Amino acid sequence: LDLRRAPLQRNIMLRHKIAKVTRDYFDENGFIEIETPTLIKSTPEGARDYLVPSRVHKGSFFALPQSPQLYKQLLMLSGFDRYIQLARCYRDEDLRADRQPEFTQIDLEMSFVEKEDVFAVAEGYMKRLFKEILGVDIETPLPRLTYTEAMESYGSDKPDTRFDMKIKDISDIVENCGFGVFADTVKNGGTVRAVTAKNAAGVYTRKEIDKLTEEAKGIGAKGLAFIRWVEDEPNCSFAKFMTADEMKAIYERTGAEKGDVVLIVADRKKTVLSVLGALRLTVAKRLEIIPDKYNLLWITEFPFFEYNEETGNWDAMHHPFTKPLDECIQYLDSAPEKVFADAYDLVLNGIELSSGSIRITDPELQKHMFEALGLSDEEAYAKFGFLTDAFRFGAPPHGGMGIGLDRLTMLLCGCDNLRDVIAFPKVSNSSELMSGAPAEVDNAQLKELSISIDE
């Protein structure tokens, strides 16, 4: 009965139109649609695999693909220059409004390309799609931000740029101030940063700011300082510790004026950016200042490694076939923090729509990446040998991306949940209500597969 509802039927029809425009556009641009296997070998790609037991090979399992990554690279090595597939993908991870355990990915790969070539094809697709589906003109080339720029200004690697409210660094202003929380944070290598909500003082009373403080603490902040400029003299939680010149400098740096609210967090840089990035979105929604439009942009130059404070190691942030930027390769062993990936995300209104990269084609560099992931030569060959062997016969430079069809449809439909654009979606506990899947199976089937269930 749910499928009879007009809104859901409208969304499913729009999904069909998006799929048709997709196939038409890529066909016209020389792409070949090729299906890749859905019963594959389990390889580490981040999330848990869905496993399928083999009846013929006792004790062995297939995995359902998290992406067609390895196969599409093999296609490039085989001479298929442009590949496209509306691929079914599976990831055994917790559900969110924008995540399902099985999903459809517009998967593409191109040979003899650099990042700019991938961007040109993807931007042409977005321009065509938005025009045909929504009648909206998308200006290209799309804006770009590096990962560092996005984090510094918006506190997110998938920023919503439909509104301003950028993060400002005031560490240099407060490093010697009388307010110990600020001064000590800077002295100990942390940072103090702020966002300004214009004309928000009437909405954000002290009680409302207390709610923001609790939200900030829930994300990891120790507290939240603020300036609430209602009368001629701003109400400030720390003004008595500051000089007039220091307060003036903060107003100038943050652009604060009468009627504004300034939110300030002091902590480690990673925590500060994460907290202010989240508060920025909360406040913008509360003030209803986010315009109803579509802002697409590229995020580029992601860090290749992330420092793990628990283990003291540098962990790889991407799948092992992502190529480092050429100028960074020299730092792979000596300075991991200086290594950036030739990777890119396409972001729409604060939601990651697509992710991709230029791939490694040098066998020695590929070996180095496996080592960085903690894989021995034997482990790497056991998992990926069929691809690395192919590299030795010569590999064209290639790259590509995957665009989430479900997520794209959700955004173009104006929905907030993927379930609203999928005919038979999974619910929050990863079950499918229509058929009752997953379900127990007959003991005879389990015995045939040599599987026993621990109670």
What are these regions (language model features)?
Residues 1-455:
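Class II aminoacyl-tRNA synthetase catalytic cores and aaRS-like
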